[in-house]
Amino acid sequence: MGAALATDVHQHLWPAELVDRLRARRRAPYLDGWTLHTRGEAPYDIDPAHHDVARRIEADQQDGVGLACVSLSAPLGIENLVRPEAGALIAAWHEGARALPDHFAAWASVPMVDPDLDELAALLRDGFVGVQLPATDLASPAAWERAAEVLRVAEEAGKPVFVHPGPEVVRPLAGTVPDWWAPVVGYVSQMQAAWWGWHAVHGRALFPRLRVLFGAGAGLAPVHHERHSARGGETPTIDPGVYVDTSSYGPQALDALVRVLGVDVLALGSDRPYAAPLGRLLGDAATYAIRVANPQRLLHEDRIETGEGRTWPRAS
């Protein structure tokens, strides 16, 4: 018997409906052929093969991935456009995502201005695995409170919320930076702010049944828990309903996360096509947990054991 197939909770694939809408635009975000233009990052040449459905399925199968959860690319800033523009692009995303083969599942998205809560509830009933929100819209305790209505819809539907890096802020005085700057500097700081915003607002008390996934290992924010405690923060308990994914990190970073959070809340998320799914992680048992068991629990287990008295271990 072969190894159990993995679930990758974090991939991106642009369906034709979304590509057509982006090409029809003349201001950011837009596509000129296959060159992507956004407000906060340099123009980026997209490889069309990265968004070819058949090639993606083949690549996933080679990596032992049986289900890929795809989401709208939040760094484009679509969710924060004026409402009619955001609505049209997000509708194109949902239309294209629905038509993908069964190898894929999809995260829903919402405009951050005047989100249609009834439509979101319908999408979550209609098979979308959860809702993705940009980290830039969850970057403080107050920001989490502003998103409360959307979070409540997900909680009532028994579906998780995926916190994903959002658009980079335009900084005219920053000068020229390398292409890796936004993913390594900007996105990481976004994820850290969202992580600490959730804890500072006491998110679990507000949303007792909500499952939350932080992309990119939450920017390794959990590894900073000792600094958080040293500077006056309360020592958080380990929350089995708050997950982090593995995207763009390797054994050293993931080992550090496991030392702090344990293995049960680390889920395979590759960010494909920008990185490949990790294969073997920290031994056989951990590999199975991260690639198979944890993603399935994130997506489907609508019950959270609060773990009274369990505090974050000291990394050593």
Whereabouts are the PLM-identified features?
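Short glycine-enriched loops at secondary-structure junctions
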Residues: M112-V113, P165-V170, P273-Y274
